Amino acid sequence: MLIENTNDRFGIVIDAGSSGSRIHVFKWQDTESLLHATNQDSQSILQSVPHIHQEKDWTFKLNPGLSSFEKKPQDAYKSHIKPLLDFAKNIIPESHWSSCPVFIQATAGMRLLPQDIQSSILDGLCQGLKHPAEFLVEDCSAQIQVIDGETEGLYGWLGLNYLYGHFNDYNPEVSDHFTFGFMDMGGASTQIAFAPHDSGEIARHRDDIATIFLRSVNGDLQKWDVFVSTWLGFGANQARRRYLAQLINTLPENTNDYENDDFSTRNLNDPCMPRGSSTDFEFKDTIFHIAGSGNYEQCTKSIYPLLLKNMPCDDEPCLFNGVHAPRIDFANDKFIGTSEYWYTANDVFKLGGEYNFDKFSKSLREFCNSNWTQILANSDKGVYNSIPENFLKDACFKGNWVLNILHEGFDMPRIDVDAENVNDRPLFQSVEKVEERELSWTLGRILLYASGSILAGNDDFMVGIAPSERRTKLTGKKFIPGKLLESDQLRKQSSSLSNKGFLMWFAIICCIFYLIFHRSHIIRRRFSGLYNITKDFKTGIRRRLKFLRRSDPFSRLEEGELGTDVDGFKDVYRMKSSSMFDLGKSSATMQREHEPQRTASQSANLAPSNLRPAFSMADFSKFKDSRLYD
């Protein structure tokens, strides 16, 4: 248990991923107390976002993932989330529990579940957190939710640049603030988020750029324009599956007009696996035997079509799979990659950190062209950090996929980190930790909350994330507030407006009743027809009020009495919380996760000016002759 400090503030973020849920406990100082600091570092503190602290042992993971409760959503809180919160109770002083917000942010696995199952699980978590209400839960729809890939990418960008101190010593009068671009490659998707250095590119692509608002301790507003995009199906594992399916689908018997010979070839050669290695792959209920042929050049060329560079874009420059983005100025826009960018480079090739194309491609070539027995012998010697054999079999493909994404997908130049035009930072570097702290998007979420809790400064702008205009139009995506109580303020404002409206209508109704009851003789003479209508209306109201006094079934519904009929309608009304209604937008939001396959009608809607062929031999002219690498 921590030594209690009344100025401490705590926050909890649970990353509910596909394989498991990991809780993160964070701490920062009350910003009001920092305003009165008088030490020599006070000026720097005031011009920075709150300092978020996390000890190494303030995280804990529980397997399997939240999505595993799809058959028993009612058990998700007690069996999965409560043990994580019990872990947090051993860190956070009890006096701080009620003021400690909990964010349960579900990602990969939950995104794949049907909407009704998502809602059932999340609604059960909301009820579990509120009864009993040990931690701060203001709004379930904002705190317990499935987040899309873009939101996850923006949180990752926030967490990355916070760890590098790019939100500290902020001068609002300076327009040029450096930040790192964020690249993340998981098993299912890949993401990019960066603040373009070129203001002209921001202006040209304004409708594609999100805006992040932070607040320094002294109240100064920090405004960051960030482009973000995510590609579902372009993660390392899903790309591998698409690649093997491509090998099968290109067989002659699978492309002719005869169905009786489909899948007659069950043995295939894979240039992206080391020679002598083998594996089985199931495709359309058929098992295929894959044998490695170990050819680096052929592997690189075979992978290139998976980027779908031929997909039409509605604007330029075009990245891949029909996604356009602001032009990346690699002379000034520098990037950091995590997850697969780090694991592949570091665990297999010992080349994590600053990226060097020549060194990485040479090591990858040697590995891909090696015999499987030699790779196993190296593994026994500890060369590959004790990576399991099935991971080693995929390492050649994953290394090539990383190269293709970086240089063909994002058009990153193939230059060394010590080249003259790289300035003082490398074009790209892969990391797992920054200053001994794990790089996690959860840090970005709690930073947004802590920054939004600052009371100093102008209230004209709320701390949070404003989605791009395009996302708002296409999916209805809304502003993500940093501070939970913003919703309370909005409700208060709405309530205030409602009260004013109620008073106005009440005054009008009083005037009407005065005319009806006190000047009815005038009304009858001049507006006898209108009077009769009014009289009938009053009679109907009296009858309705009499009925309502006798029975109010809908009020009983609100109280939870669902066992009785409601005017003969049985089992028609299904009770849902506000969070369940809000979650209906998540499926639309996922459309931004650019799936690798798109229907013809969708492609036609993009109205491209220039269509590129899928690929031709000209596409391979960029690959150097293998003799140049030997």
Curated annotation (Swiss-Prot):
It is an enzyme of class 3 (hydrolase). Activity is inhibited both by interaction with VMA13 and by V-ATPase acidification of the lumen. The activity of VMA13 is not required for YND1 inhibition. It is a single-pass membrane protein. Pathway: Protein modification; protein glycosylation. One of its GO terms (cellular component) is membrane. Residues 586-606 are annotated as: Disordered. One of its GO terms (biological process) is sphingolipid metabolic process. It catalyses: a ribonucleoside 5'-triphosphate + 2 H2O = a ribonucleoside 5'-phosphate + 2 phosphate + 2 H(+). Disruption phenotype: Cells are partially resistant to E4orf4 and can partially suppress the spindle checkpoint defect in CDC55 deletion mutant. Does not suppress the rapamycin-resistance of CDC55 deletion mutant. YND1 and CDC55 double mutant is fully resistant to E4orf4. Deletion mutant suppresses the synthetic lethality of triple mutants, where UPC2 and ECM22 are knocked out along with either HAP1, ERG6 or ERG28. The keyword Isomerase does not apply. Keywords: ATP-binding, Golgi apparatus, Hydrolase, Lipid metabolism, Membrane, Nucleotide-binding, Sphingolipid metabolism, Transmembrane, Transmembrane helix. Residues 518-630 are cytoplasmic. It comes from the Eukaryota. The active site is at E152. Residues 1-500 are lumenal. InterPro entries: GDA1_CD39_NTPase. Its cofactor is Ca(2+); Mg(2+); Mn(2+). GO terms for molecular function: apyrase activity; ATP binding; GDP phosphatase activity; nucleoside diphosphate phosphatase activity; ribonucleoside triphosphate phosphatase activity; UDP phosphatase activity. The keyword Nucleotide-binding applies. Gene3D superfamilies: 3.30.420.40, Exopolyphosphatase. Domain 2 (3.30.420.150). Present with 450 molecules/cell in log phase SD medium. Belongs to the GDA1/CD39 NTPase family. Catalyzes the hydrolysis of phosphoanhydride bonds of nucleoside tri- and di-phosphates. Has equal high activity toward ADP/ATP, GDP/GTP, and UDP/UTP and approximately 50% less toward CDP/CTP and thiamine pyrophosphate. Has no activity toward GMP. Required for Golgi glycosylation and cell wall integrity. Together with CDC55, required for adenovirus E4orf4 (early region 4 open reading frame 4) induced toxicity, the apyrase activity is not required for this function. Plays a role in sphingolipid synthesis. This is Golgi apyrase. It comes from Saccharomyces cerevisiae (strain ATCC 204508 / S288c) (Baker's yeast). The lineage of its organism: Eukaryota, Fungi, Dikarya, Ascomycota, Saccharomycotina. The gene is YND1.
